[in-house]
Amino acid sequence: LIHRATKVPVGKDQEQHLELTRRFARRFNNIYGVEFFPEPQNFNFGHDAVKVPGLDGSGKMGKSEGNCISLIDEEKVIRKKVMKAVTDEGPKTPDSEMSEPIKNLFTILDLVSTPDTVAYFTEQYKNCSIRYGDLKKQLAEDILKYTLPIKERYADIINDEAYLRKVVTCGAERARA
């Protein structure tokens, strides 16, 4: 509210917080008879909000849950986290339903991999020939490929002291205004 934002990029799991913020804005505006605080709306870049599942086979991915991959994690760390992801004993019958931990891995695969890769591993699962080690290795590679531009941009920003000073100065001026 303090920034009087009209659009806020939040995930599906944070929408209830945004609704609470809208209620606060409405209440303040009604009590004081002004339109001071806009009611912020969820912003999602034209896509439905996606809940990224955790690597431990349950719930969402999150730092507090200890089951997340940071966008700036080092290569070795990402590989280690993915290889430790929870799996099951594998499908016993063709076209069997996936367990929750496996669905989670396939959801992440769908987010970072090519459709051909997803189709390949889906077919492997359906015909009971999937090797989870191969799936995890491919998933780690695809996560690394997906996060590389983010890491490069982060490194550019973090190493540009002049830019960082400018951002801090502008931010401080806007906060005081």
Show which residues each predicted segment covers.
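Conserved alpha/beta enzyme-core scaffolds, especially Rossmann-like or related mixed alpha/beta domains
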Residues: L1-Q14, I158
